[in-house]
């Protein structure tokens, strides 16, 4: 069985290692500057030695370590800080933080004031924090006058930016107008049942009595006799009755054949349908009634209408529009046959 050899360090080597460890510099910072390399303004050069301690038992001394191990445990680190000194940088950072805090506190106080003014003198909610009661934070004494001026300018800009949309909204509210400013209010022109019944009674009285008021006979150029309004008629008003003999169609055809034989007689016959039957009002015979003398026009101011009284139809004329005094009364005869137009050319107009 072979025996192994144990290698031991000579005592001279251990002594040399102890001497090197004793003369090595400590962990404090030492400024190093090589020849020909002066320190520039604003540049801080530090050469620090960070000593790495090996995990050793407290019984072992530094003399037991080899010189190679001692050299490896020491490292030189050179730190360069170009630019301004560190103290100035730290001071500027603190000033920026202080100004930011001042701006935030001022903006918060203004927002709280605006909320309070909108809310009015109402009592605050129980869970709400009373931020408005707290006074605004004053800038710390470390801030100089320039920082305070910058904070005020920033606060003014923020307030202007918030007030601008309010002005726009106020302008919009001022421009809002009612719909009635552009369109008039439309009121119903319908008449009540009582009003309609009273009008029907008046028409019945006028028709049965035969009164014809508000008109007169006058000579019209190119037409002969005509009827002129002597008072104002409103739209829908009763004007006059087309009065004559009410006959059925069979009797009307016989009379019409007789009237054709005498050209000087003329034709004043008006045909209409009532309850699925055709009737005719013959006003050829000369009377003092004015309805038979109203002339024809396609753009007249009157129109015919049937009015029933006790089951008997009456042909009446009502105003199709407002009629002024002195205006001629006209209505459309409604005859478009070729024979009638050839006999009476004025029916075209």
UniProtKB/Swiss-Prot annotation:
The modification Phosphothreonine is found at residue 138. The modification Phosphoserine is found at residue 57. Ubiquitinated and degraded by the DCX(DTL) complex. GO terms for biological process: cell division; negative regulation of transcription by RNA polymerase II; peptidyl-lysine monomethylation; regulation of DNA damage response, signal transduction by p53 class mediator. Belongs to the class V-like SAM-binding methyltransferase superfamily. Histone-lysine methyltransferase family. PR/SET subfamily. Residues 213-334 form the SET domain. The gene is Kmt5a. Its EC number is 2.1.1.-, 2.1.1.361. CDD domains: SET_SETD8 (cd10528). Protein-lysine N-methyltransferase that monomethylates both histones and non-histone proteins. Specifically monomethylates 'Lys-20' of histone H4 (H4K20me1). H4K20me1 is enriched during mitosis and represents a specific tag for epigenetic transcriptional repression. Mainly functions in euchromatin regions, thereby playing a central role in the silencing of euchromatic genes. Required for cell proliferation, probably by contributing to the maintenance of proper higher-order structure of DNA during mitosis. Involved in chromosome condensation and proper cytokinesis. Coiled coil: none annotated. Interacts with L3MBTL1. Interacts with SIRT2 (phosphorylated form); the interaction is direct, stimulates KMT5A-mediated methyltransferase activity at histone H4 'Lys-20' (H4K20me1) and is increased in a H(2)O(2)-induced oxidative stress-dependent manner. It comes from Mus musculus (Mouse). Keywords: Cell cycle, Cell division, Chromatin regulator, Chromosome, Methyltransferase, Mitosis, Nucleus, Phosphoprotein, Repressor, S-adenosyl-L-methionine, Transcription, Transcription regulation, Transferase, Ubl conjugation. GO terms for cellular component: chromosome; nucleus. It comes from the Eukaryota. It catalyses: L-lysyl(20)-[histone H4] + S-adenosyl-L-methionine = N(6)-methyl-L-lysyl(20)-[histone H4] + S-adenosyl-L-homocysteine + H(+); L-lysyl-[protein] + S-adenosyl-L-methionine = N(6)-methyl-L-lysyl-[protein] + S-adenosyl-L-homocysteine + H(+). It is found in: Nucleus; Chromosome. GO terms for molecular function: histone H4K20 monomethyltransferase activity; histone methyltransferase activity; protein-lysine N-methyltransferase activity. Residues 154-170 have a biased composition (Basic residues). This is N-lysine methyltransferase KMT5A. Its main location: nucleus. PROSITE patterns: SAM_MT43_PR_SET, SET. Pfam families: SET. S-adenosyl-L-methionine binds at residues 223-225, 268, 295-296.
């Amino acid at each position: 069985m072979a025996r192994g050899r144990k290698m031991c360090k000579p005592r001279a080597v251990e002594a040399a290692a102890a001497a090197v460890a004793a003369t090595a510099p400590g962990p404090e910072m030492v400024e190093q500057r090589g020849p020909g390399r002066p320190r520039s303004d604003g540049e801080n050069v530090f050469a620090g030695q960070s000593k790495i301690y090996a995990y050793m038992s407290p019984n072992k001394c530094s003399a037991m370590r080899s010189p190679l191990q001692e050299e490896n445990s020491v490292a030189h680190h050179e730190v360069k800080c170009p630019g301004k000194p560190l103290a100035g940088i730290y001071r500027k950072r603190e000033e920026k933080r202080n100004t930011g805090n001042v701006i935030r506190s001022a903006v918060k106080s203004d927002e709280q004031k605006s909320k309070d003014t909108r809310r009015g003198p109402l009592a605050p909610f129980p869970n709400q924090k009373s931020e408005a009661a707290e006074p605004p934070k004053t800038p710390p004494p470390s801030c100089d006058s320039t920082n305070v001026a910058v904070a005020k300018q920033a606060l003014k800009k923020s307030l202007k930016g918030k007030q601008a949309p309010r002005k726009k909204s106020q302008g919009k509210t001022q421009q809002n107008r009612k719909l009635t400013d552009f369109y008039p209010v439309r009121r119903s022109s319908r008449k009540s049942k009582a009003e309609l019944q009273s009008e029907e009674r008046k028409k019945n009285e006028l028709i049965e009595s035969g009164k014809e008021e508000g008109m007169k006979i006058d000579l019209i150029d190119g037409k002969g006799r005509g009827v002129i309004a002597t008072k104002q008629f409103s739209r829908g008003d009763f004007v006059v009755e087309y009065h004559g003999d009410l006959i059925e169609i069979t009797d009307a055809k016989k009379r019409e054949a007789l009237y054709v034989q005498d050209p000087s007689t003329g034709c004043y016959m008006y045909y209409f349908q009532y309850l699925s039957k055709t009737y005719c009002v013959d006003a050829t015979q000369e009377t003092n009634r004015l309805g038979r003398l109203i002339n024809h026009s396609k753009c007249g101011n009157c129109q015919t209408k049937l009015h029933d009284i006790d089951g008997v139809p009456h042909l009446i004329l009502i105003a199709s529009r407002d009629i002024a005094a002195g205006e001629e009364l006209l209505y459309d005869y409604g005859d478009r046959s070729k024979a009638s137009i050839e006999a009476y050319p004025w029916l075209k107009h």
